[in-house]
Amino acid sequence: MKKRALVSVSNKTGVVEFVKGLLEQGIEVISTGGTKKLLEENGLQVMGISEVTGFPEIMDGRVKTLHPNIHGGLLAVRDNEAHVAEMSELGIQLIDFVVVNLYPFKETIAKPDVTFADAIENIDIGGPTMIRSAAKNHKFVSVIVDPADYDVVLAELKEKGEVTDETKRKLAAKVFRHTAAYDALISNYLTEQMGEESPEILTVTFEKKQDLRYGENPHQKATFYKAPFAVASSVAYAEQLHGKELSYNNINDADAALSIVKEFTEPAVVAVKHMNPCGVGVGTDIHEAYTRAYEADPVSIFGGIIAANREIDKRVAEKLHEIFLEIIIAPSFSKEALEVLQSKKNLRLLTVNIEKTTSASKKLTSVQGGLLVQEEDTLALNEETIIIPTKREPTEQEWNDLKLAWKVVKHVKSNAIVLAKDNMTIGVGAGQMNRVGSAKIAISQAGSKAQGSALASDAFFPMPDTVEEAAKAGITAIIQPGGSIRDEDSIKKADEYGITMVFTGVRHFKH
């Protein structure tokens, strides 16, 4: 009996060549709508779906393949005598290949002017039903949803006269991944349209971007997946201009650097090591900003990741070329800068659209047996709601330093302390189990520069010991959330030493 293939695709890539290959193997082809028209325009003889169903396509094509003559041909168990007899009695013919990809729902909802009606109209019904039927019966049916698999199927047909069982199983698994992702996009879109923030079932879908050499350590396997829609200013959608492939740790560090540099509208440069900032500088131009970021910690920047929010020009590139770096991220690189930096063959150069995130996207964190979901911490300092409980208010220079330190501290692993002075960080204390310990590290790192600097803390002071350490170092201004039952002790201690202190009312833990 002649084998048959049903072909109905929205993504027409390679379909003409593939169907030509099927016809050359003596396979009869059934097709629908626009796919049938394209194939016939290219001189390929195919059968219309109505010839199989005996029923016309109706309701603007909404109903065309939902018919027993189609699904009977797909789902029949061919070594089941009862199934075979039933097919013969009803005049149903077998279908051996299904080549289908689905209505472009993802592409439709990505359009800025999409209407709800347009989105709904691009929810495919017949396509998912067909490929699920075929995938369920993959012992007998080959189902192809990805044009990348066309060559594999044709090669096996030419070499062996059939598609191997292993390939059929792989194709079937891909189908169910395909439909699961498709349904996840639909459910997420409708959930967002209804404004539901915490649905009883969370559906997420990501697409493979690349396999990684290894994970956080060489013995760990790892893969990088990207969100289905382009996320402004993200590593997942950055363009790599030069250098080795990104590693797992590179991606984490680059993401951290991007998150920090997006805090600034003025020219800024951020240096990151192990997802913590080791130097942040701002200036009137990107060269001044880089100089400050470098001077913030010229030791830790070695082997680090640099993110800038302005184009890298030749002058800055020549300075960057002097030290070993893993990655440089910027909105763009001048031609002359690229010539300088590309002389280092392993240095990764990424371009990305640096944009401040205006709405809180969801952050997913895996735990054993579950997943934590929260909004990203994008809350900026609100100068209208701050409280200054001390006798002295910040000077203009202190206020500038406080704001810089506050922007940075929320990106430092808790317990976090950041010292800033003259448009740059001068000390970062990260990840200590007690707050005063982080303060001591930041102060030690700053050395004599701590005199006259500003200190930011990601959470309140449980006791006044951090204020005492700040006073010893000559720090003159502090910014912190406030809210401790011992706030009054810290306020009194600050007043005792003439330190101005700002309460933001906002905590910025980062774990």
UniProtKB/Swiss-Prot annotation:
GO terms for biological process: 'de novo' IMP biosynthetic process. InterPro entries: AICAR_Tfase_dup_dom_sf (IPR024051), Cytidine_deaminase-like (IPR016193), MGS-like_dom (IPR011607), MGS-like_dom_sf (IPR036914), PurH-like (IPR002695). CDD domains: IMPCH. Keywords: Hydrolase, Multifunctional enzyme, Purine biosynthesis, Transferase. Residues 1-145 form the MGS-like domain. Belongs to the PurH family. Pathway: Purine metabolism; IMP biosynthesis via de novo pathway; 5-formamido-1-(5-phospho-D-ribosyl)imidazole-4-carboxamide from 5-amino-1-(5-phospho-D-ribosyl)imidazole-4-carboxamide (10-formyl THF route): step 1/1; Purine metabolism; IMP biosynthesis via de novo pathway; IMP from 5-formamido-1-(5-phospho-D-ribosyl)imidazole-4-carboxamide: step 1/1. The IMP cyclohydrolase activity resides in the N-terminal region. One of its GO terms (cellular component) is cytosol. It comes from Bacillus cytotoxicus (strain DSM 22905 / CIP 110041 / 391-98 / NVH 391-98). It comes from the Bacteria. One of its GO terms (molecular function) is phosphoribosylaminoimidazolecarboxamide formyltransferase activity. This is Bifunctional purine biosynthesis protein PurH. It catalyses: (6R)-10-formyltetrahydrofolate + 5-amino-1-(5-phospho-beta-D-ribosyl)imidazole-4-carboxamide = 5-formamido-1-(5-phospho-D-ribosyl)imidazole-4-carboxamide + (6S)-5,6,7,8-tetrahydrofolate; IMP + H2O = 5-formamido-1-(5-phospho-D-ribosyl)imidazole-4-carboxamide. Pfam families: AICARFT_IMPCHas, MGS. Its EC number is 2.1.2.3, 3.5.4.10.
